[in-house]
Amino acid sequence: MFAKLKKKIAEETAVAQRPGGATRIPRSVSKESVASMGADSGDDFASDGSSSREDLSSQLLRRNEQIRKLEARLSDYAEQVRNLQKIKEKLEIALEKHQDSSMRKFQEQNETFQANRAKMAEGLALALARKDQEWSEKMDQLEKEKNILTAQLQEMKNQSMNLFQRRDEMDELEGFQQQELSKIKHMLLKKEESLGKMEQELEARTRELSRTQEELMNSNQMSSDLSQKLEELQRHYSTLEEQRDHVIASKTGAESKITALEQKEQELQALIQQLSIDLQKVTAETQEKEDVITHLQEKVASLEKRLEQNLSGEEHLQELLKEKTLAEQNLEDTRQQLLAARSSQAKAINTLETRVRELEQTLQASEEQLQQSKGIVAAQETQIQELAAANQESSHVQQQALALEQQFLERTQALEAQIVALERTRAADQTTAEQGMRQLEQENAALKECRNEYERSLQNHQFELKKLKEEWSQREIVSVAMAQALEEVRKQREEFQQQAANLTAIIDEKEQNLREKTEVLLQKEQEILQLERGHNSALLQIHQLQAELEALRTLKAEEAAVVAEQEDLLRLRGPLQAEALSVNESHVTSRAMQDPVFQLPTAGRTPNGEVGAMDLTQLQKEKQDLEQQLLEKNKTIKQMQQRMLELRKTLQKELKIRPDNELFEVREKPGPEMANMAPSVTNNTDLTDAREINFEYLKHVVLKFMSCRESEAFHLIKAVSVLLNFSQEEENMLKETLEYKMSWFGSKPAPKGSIRPSISNPRIPWS
């Protein structure tokens, strides 16, 4: 580094040394002393001519002593210069060693830092690649699950449509059954009227028989003429006895049929009891399912709380929330199906009870008819006995009896015709009762089939609920795993950030150490420069002393040349020292610029910090979006629960009001117009109730649509369009206006025509 300076110093020392051991001048001799000594020597040489030899010898001795002193001083200065050169060489060697060791350390630290940086970059790249692969796999799995859930949702929609169709068919069957019941009631009323007419005719004929008895009492005088008629009457008596036997046989047959009907009634009661037991079982099962549903709702609430506490900012939570809403909709559909099954079973039981009551009434009416026929037969027997007594007592009334035979025969024929008509009516009643029993049996079979279908559907829904629970548990596990993975990723990011901070701190420390070492090097270089300056000054003094000695030994003429040479040397050493200083500074600056450690912190700090800030901002934005979506979905869930409560209340009111009104209308109008009036009244009540329900729901939806925010109103567009029968263009216009209100710089949508009620589209009743 200082090769040029070393060469110059060696040349100067070689010039300064004389061949044959030149004497040294002491360091303290200055230019003034040299000048004074030259002046003295000149004076002395000038005075040599005039002085004596003794003075010359004394002066020479003095000069020799002075020369010896100067040589001793020069030798001391030479030793000091040698020592200084040795110290300088040692310092240069130590400085070179220190520079080499520091450069090696810097290179090693730079290599280790670059290796660590490369390892960290590779690790970060591998970790990011792994995370990307994991997220892509998870996204694929979530998309597959989404497709599966959409297929399940489509199947559930199809099932719900099938259930609605079945419910409509059940409603139609109930309407037909009500019409048939009204017809049967009308027929029974007609038969009761005919039976009343027959009773009136029987009463009139009993009156006629009493009149005939009075006539027979009056005709006792004519018993002699009626002896022949008595024989005929006896024959007629035998025929009447045969008829009585026939009537008794028919009575026994009717009693047997009555017992059979009672047995069937008992069987029906047993079936009703079984149905009630099944109903109790179904209610118990529904209560258990409602408990399960409430438990699931509590789980859903707890999961929502956990999600709100976790505040995880990932997109798969949105899909989990969608699946949660789908599961809640499925639960609500199962509740509606259970309510429909309950209502249908309750209606079926009510219809069965009413039919059993009607059959009991028909049985009571048939028993009353049998009692009346028994009374008629007993009255006929009493009449026959009275006739026999009258025949025995009044044999002389035979002629009058012959006259009355024809009348009696006519009356008996009329009675026989009446009995035949009664038997026919009884047979018709029996056939109608049997038909009613068959219809009831068929309806019971249909109800059993419906019950089996509902049980199957309930089992299917239970199985689906189990599947949904399992899927929900799996989703919970997946969400927990995702949360753990996110926490691990966050921990890794924090660790990477800490490592980056530690590395930056290490780099700062190394920079500080470099600065300190550079400062130490600069101080040492300054000391070296000071030593070189001292050495140069010493060399200058030595050269001056040598010049003085040469001037003393030579003539005064040579002193001027020596002085000029010394001045030239001084002039040359100034730029040489400046060049050495500039070379040192340029070398130090080149080392500092070539050292890659100074450029590392700028290249190594910024990307990590920028990536962390971007990730934090994105996570915060995603967290805010997820929180808003959770709040909106919670609000929609609460709105759906309120709607379900309102619909339950309206359905309960409808179920409470409808049967009482129907019974009241049936009792008030028992004429021939019942067959046409009853179904029309029920249809009108159904329509009015449905309209009231639709109006209340429409009012609720419109008020909610007008009072809520734009983001919530955007979800209610479909309901408003369905209730108000909007067309697709009107619905799109509503969406565009809401989007214009929600946006900041959107353009206002152009009106596509006046909104008119869609008459062509039929109104779809809300269900």
UniProtKB/Swiss-Prot annotation:
Phenotype for residue 12 to A: No effect on TBC1D23-binding
Subcellular location: Golgi apparatus membrane; Golgi apparatus, trans-Golgi network membrane; Cytoplasmic vesicle, Secretory vesicle, Acrosome
UniProt keyword NADP, yes or no: no
Effect of residue 6 to A: Decreased TBC1D23-binding
Single GO cellular component term: trans-Golgi network
Keywords: ADP-ribosylation, Coiled coil, Cytoplasmic vesicle, Golgi apparatus, Membrane, Phosphoprotein
Residues annotated as domain GRIP: 688-737
Quaternary structure and interacting proteins, as annotated: Interacts with RAB6A. Directly interacts with TBC1D23. Interacts with FAM91A1; this interaction may be mediated by TBC1D23. Interacts with ARL1; this interaction recruits Golgin-97/GOLGA1 onto the Golgi apparatus.
Protein name: Golgin subfamily A member 1
Species of the source: Homo sapiens (Human)
